[in-house]
Amino acid sequence: MNRGFFNMLGRRPFPAPTAMWRPRRRRQAAPMPARNGLASQIQQLTTAVSALVIGQATRPQNPRPRPPPRQKKQAPKQPPKPKKPKPQEKKKKQPAKTKPGKRQRMALKLEADRLFDVKNEDGDVIGHALAMEGKVMKPLHVKGTIDHPVLSKLKFTKSSAYDMEFAQLPVNMRSEAFTYTSEHPEGFYNWHHGAVQYSGGRFTIPRGVGGRGDSGRPIMDNSGRVVAIVLGGADEGTRTALSVVTWNSKGKTIKTTPEGTEEWSAAPLVTAMCLLGNVSFPCNRPPTCYTREPSRALDILEENVNHEAYDTLLNAILRCGSSGRSKRSVTDDFTLTSPYLGTCSYCHHTEPCFSPIKIEQVWDEADDNTIRIQTSAQFGYDKSGAASTNKYRYMSFEQDHTVKEGTMDDIKISTSGPCRRLSYKGYFLLAKCPPGDSVTVSIASSNSATSCTMARKIKPKFVGREKYDLPPVHGKKIPCTVYDRLKETTAGYITMHRPGPHAYTSYLEESSGKVYAKPPSGKNITYECKCGDYKTGTVTTRTEITGCTAIKQCVAYKSDQTKWVFNSPDLIRHADHTAQGKLHLPFKLIPSTCMVPVAHAPNVIHGFKHISLQLDTDHLTLLTTRRLGANPEPTTEWIIGKTVRNFTVDRDGLEYIWGNHEPVRVYAQESAPGDPHGWPHEIVQHYYHRHPVYTILAVASAAVAMMIGVTVAALCACKARRECLTPYALAPNAVIPTSLALLCCVRSANAETFTETMSYFWSNSQPFFWVQLCIPLAAVIVLMRCCSCCLPFLVVAGAYLAKVDAYEHATTVPNVPQIPYKALVERAGYAPLNLEITVMSSEVLPSTNQEYITCKFTTVVPSPKVKCCGSLECQPAAHADYTCKVFGGVYPFMWGGAQCFCDSENSQMSEAYVELSADCATDHAQAIKVHTAAMKVGLRIVYGNTTSFLDVYVNGVTPGTSKDLKVIAGPISASFTPFDHKVVIHRGLVYNYDFPEYGAMKPGVFGDIQATSLTSKDLIASTDIRLLKPSAKNVHVPYTQAASGFEMWKNNSGRPLQETAPFGCKIAVNPLRAVDCSYGNIPISIDIPNAAFIRTSDAPLVSTVKCDVSECTYSADFGGMATLQYVSDREGQCPVHSHSSTATLQESTVHVLEKGAVTVHFSTASPQANFIVSLCGKKTTCNAECKPPADHIVSTPHKNDQEFQAAISKTSWSWLFALFGGASSLLIIGLTIFACSMMLTSTRR
């Protein structure tokens, strides 16, 4: 289905559009008749200019801001008039902001007649379709109809792999279609919203430019050619990476999809409904707003705090009227809140105090030493709550306790030294600080100076494998996490609530035995007294409280129910508003890149089966190594200064990583001093370095054999001499030598004939007679049966032969990536076909089950509930690790005066629970169980002149296809996976770790807080929270808690599998897999198409071939060169192949003439390479005496393994046989002489 899509983009079958501009021809071709004459051309030109010149179209919009004032006249109750000119000034600036740039104007001009809207059933534009190269193309995920009378009726061909569909463009529209290009060098390109940057193989745009509804828009170069088609985007902090469709030089479509991509098809709007009491209303159109009714607006937010459309409701609450701009300010949400006073542990670095800039919390999860601070003051607002970039506001700790303001220059942040303020919003500051044991935020103004210090260790952080104090100017960029400085980002929510009543003695005055309630100017206060009877009231001016004679009999407080305050443990929760709201936590932790140093590259000295790394660094740098065989033996060491490290390297290879350099893999060659084809001492020297044990055994055995042979030969010669010196006695009693006497004992023998044998069987054993007689008869019967079945077999075989369209070839390929396996397919009646199979990549894909995710927790301590002269009771709550406790006898007196009348009956309900940290979305770990693993390999198969790439599962069942080729692989010879049953994934690194089961949490251990996903509501935790009794000096919630198990695990997690996996596996995630593991062998069955074979009559026939090896160096590379001299009957292509595993040829096919010679290169690991080579099926033997390589260490793995018969050179065998032959000859000669002497001297009477 996709093949037509490729061909459509690759062949360019349609002519390019002409240079002449013909505006909006597509809209006039079908519905209207063609106009003739000069008037028609002038009208078309006028229409095109008015539609395309955007700058002229925007200028007449200046007088249009007149309608809004008409609506404002309907509400004459609002007295302040200065508010009217402010929106007019803003609207005057709108045309300047929306004026398109040069790139945008060019894109709009080119899109006018070539880009079509795609609409849904409601008529909303949800995407776009593009006319290009004779086709109309539309993203597949854009479900709608093209807004064109002709194009909407076309039949589209779908390509799900590339998320595109296309149809033939009508002939009368083809000349105006876009053309595409596969050339897109790095730089900037044009699209509907301005400039698009192409760098590092990705298209990116500034954040906030483009979004839903832009799917299908083209990205064009300066010539107007389409470079890519936009499908979606992925938010990456300050920029957005685009998901696009591009084309390579061959016209093949390439889809690029960044991680986290969202499709940019405008989804239909679904209006969410919110509640207020029993009345429902659209969340984007609440019945009131905060400016009109602050208290009711907060009621609406609190009642819908858990609604999915809470953000939409919050946005609508913050603006009044539907006629205004739909886009709100990014800093106006904290106008709902108020600063407050809180208890600071260390004010002015000395003692506790009630501070207007109390530090609530400090986050230091970023990798660039940036911290996020939450305080009780608010930044970016003036005292009225309006957004002001250079101001902050705080709650005054003077008697009036009013909100005051100051300039941001008065705010100072420090740790062990001053910090650099990066950004601020609401309660939050973002700063980059040096390491220290505490964080201090201070207000240093001319009127007053105050500070708050929080004990918090800010440790020096670094990313990568090299420690540094300051980031370098030049180096290498690697992934890291930083706090986003943009104020629009959100890391989650912070809980808010209405403030409770706090009593202040400054609101009471005692004079002449009377008590007066004295409210601040323009404020209301409420007093409660126990002067015999209970008395209460709310006053706005100085008022006497009758019947009371002492201040301690009364409390007075003010309570503002039109503002939220942070859910701080230093504030009392209001009794009438226990519900909570929430606001966004700014400065989200996002993935980014950080500049890190790169240490000096090590000076590597290669030796025989070892390397020496001469290291020199002025900062701590990590050196890790692992072997690439079955036993990785990983090592880890932090190094500083000058040093030398030595490592042994074998044939399997060694990988070392020095600092932030890329991993380096080295392999040992079988290099050694001496000469395997030289004199004996050179042979012994060579093999002693390669195989010391066997060489020592061989030399010792030869020496022992020589000594034994010489000794036995000498002894036998002495014995023979002594026995043979005595002559025979010619006496009457002479004896015959034993050797002659033995000859007389030899008896003659002859075989019986067949007739005699059968006669014997007939007379003595008739059953054996019949058995012997039936043997020839059985042979005749079997032969006749075979001849009778031969003809039907050939008929059946001939019937099926015509249906076979492929030839099956089975082989076994080593699972070593990038090492080709070569074979020669010999089929009767056809010329030999060369076959090359290369495992390009392999993946071990385990089936996984995520048990839970865990991360650092945040302890939420809500504002306590305080009840005077009574008791409270805890209620169950649906929070993780929720703890509640009621304490009595609290707060008889507080800062500023009496809070409760009673001395011991007062009670406080303290609560605490945990939540996932605000930065959990970026910094969390996945606990995963691993089950049965599958294996998938990417194969490159070359047969004849055809090359195919395909992916196939190695299970022996699932076939893989590529064009006419069918492959079945597996099962692999040995099952293997580097993963244990339980693994943990953290920031792309994989660890084998036996984590606790889901629901079995333990405080201070990995998994102390668990959730099935980052957005799920099933959070469970066990952190050992223990609430303590508060002291009477101020409102607070003391508690103790276990440390974060996630943080403890991060500090003791060990090395990841990426650095310790055996067989050189590369570990990857999303999905979890092990890549390019070199182990085992893969059986492969290939169905080769018949068209790939050439009949013998059509292929060159080589009659003679001779091999001469001109040069040979055994190594990992192709160090051998051989010349094949041949005689052929015609010119053509011939496959050349090595039939021995001793050597691998580099060439697969050579061009032959009628007579000549070709040179081939081969690789071997043996000093004596004797291998059979075939040229067009004609075989010959190449004998090569190879020399050892000069390089001891190489960067490529070996292509051949050593074989025993080729591991020892022919010269070595000759010398060895000579040594053993000399010793055995001496031994045999000695024994022969001894035997002869014994036979001649021993006599027999």
From Swiss-Prot:
Identify the residues that the record assigns to the Peptidase S3 domain, covering every copy. 114-264
Q: Which stretches does the entry tag as region Dimerization of the capsid protein? A: 185-195, 221-225
Q: Which Gene Ontology cellular component annotation is one that this UniProt entry carries?
A: host cell nucleus
Location of the region described as Functions as an uncleaved signal peptide for the precursor of protein E3/E2 in the Swiss-Prot/TrEMBL record: 265-279
Lipid anchor positions (S-palmitoyl cysteine): C724, C744, C745
Disulfide bond sites: C283-C289, C480-C594, C529-C554, C531-C548, C724-C745, C855-C920, C868-C900, C869-C902, C874-C884, C1065-C1077, C1107-C1182, C1112-C1186, C1134-C1176
Specify where the region named Interaction with the capsid protein lies, as residue ranges. Answer: 719-723
Site feature location: Cleavage: W264, S265, R328, S329, A751, E752, A806, Y807
User: Which segments sit on the Extracellular face?
Assistant: 329-690, 752-763, 807-1214
Q: Where are the transmembrane segments?
A: 691-718, 764-784, 786-806, 1215-1239
Active site annotated at which positions?
A: H141, D163, S215
- Identify the residue span(s) of motif Nuclear export signal: 146-156
Compositional bias per record (Polar residues), positions renumbered to this chain: 38-49
Where are the residues of the annotated region Host transcription inhibition?
A: 37-70
User: Which residues carry the site feature described as Involved in dimerization of the capsid protein?
Assistant: Y189, N222
Further remark, if any?
Structural polyprotein: Translated from a subgenomic RNA synthesized during togavirus replication.
What protein name is recorded for this chain? Structural polyprotein
Q: Which organism is it from?
A: Sindbis virus subtype Ockelbo (strain Edsbyn 82-5)
